[in-house]
């Protein structure tokens, strides 16, 4: 982890155009003292990997609400490794379509290499707390990095 505030790269993966949740999570992370690089909606795996490498990210947070996260996230960890990124990875949202129970979905994403997996019903505070735990972060003051920087 970097010597300064912990850095996260955040975005909505694949063709998913939902951006409200990541914008709210962006604000919650900043309030908790994280430096956030919000890639926005419809972000390719390669963009996550490049941004994580460029910003020396401590964590990569991936959102998906349209139910196709498994397809969109396939190979993400390979892309991160190829870019030299060794960061905590978190995925959350409505990750699968149909009647699949969340524990089954969670197991699939953990098998893909994600450190934390959250359902769409998870509150922002729980995600922030989990990222803090993963990164062993103490309370810090908020940063002033601009949205999308």
UniProtKB/Swiss-Prot annotation:
One Pfam family in the UniProt entry: B12-binding
Enzyme superclass (EC): isomerase
Catalytic activity from the UniProt record: (2S,3S)-3-methyl-L-aspartate = L-glutamate
Keywords: Cobalamin, Cobalt, Isomerase, Metal-binding
Residues that bind adenosylcob(III)alamin: 15-19, 63-65, 94-98
GO molecular function, one term: metal ion binding
EC numbers for this chain: 5.4.99.1
Entry-linked InterPro entries: Cobalamin-bd (IPR006158), Cobalamin-bd_sf (IPR036724), GlmS (IPR006394)
Domain B12-binding, chain residue ranges per copy: 5-138
Pathway: Amino-acid degradation; L-glutamate degradation via mesaconate pathway; acetate and pyruvate from L-glutamate: step 1/4
Gene3D superfamilies: Cobalamin-binding domain
Reported cofactor(s): adenosylcob(III)alamin
GO BP terms in the entry: anaerobic glutamate catabolic process; glutamate catabolic process via L-citramalate
CDD domains: Glm_B12_BD
Subunit architecture: Heterotetramer composed of 2 epsilon subunits (GlmE) and 2 sigma subunits (GlmS). GlmE exists as a homodimer and GlmS as a monomer.
Functional note: Catalyzes the carbon skeleton rearrangement of L-glutamate to L-threo-3-methylaspartate ((2S,3S)-3-methylaspartate).
Family: Belongs to the methylaspartate mutase GlmS subunit family.
Protein name per UniProt: Glutamate mutase sigma subunit
Organism field: Halobacterium salinarum (strain ATCC 700922 / JCM 11081 / NRC-1)
Lineage: Archaea, Methanobacteriati, Methanobacteriota, Stenosarchaea group, Halobacteria
């Amino acid at each position: 982890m970097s010597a300064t505030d912990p850095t996260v790269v955040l975005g909505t993966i694949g063709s998913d155009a939902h951006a409200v949740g990541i914008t709210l999570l962006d604000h919650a992370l900043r309030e908790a003292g994280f430096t956030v690089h919000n890639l926005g909606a419809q972000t390719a795996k390669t963009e996550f990997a490049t941004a994580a490498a460029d910003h020396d990210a401590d964590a990569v947070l991936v959102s998906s609400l349209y139910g196709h996260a498994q397809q969109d996230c396939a190979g993400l960890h390979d892309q991160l490794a190829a870019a030299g990124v060794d960061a905590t990875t978190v995925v959350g949202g409505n990750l699968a379509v149909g009647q699949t129970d969340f524990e089954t979905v969670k197991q699939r994403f953990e098998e893909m290499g994600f450190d934390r997996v959250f359902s769409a019903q998870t509150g922002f505070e729980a995600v922030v707390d989990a990222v803090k735990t993963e990164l062993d972060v103490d309370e810090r003051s908020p940063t002033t990095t601009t949205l999308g920087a």
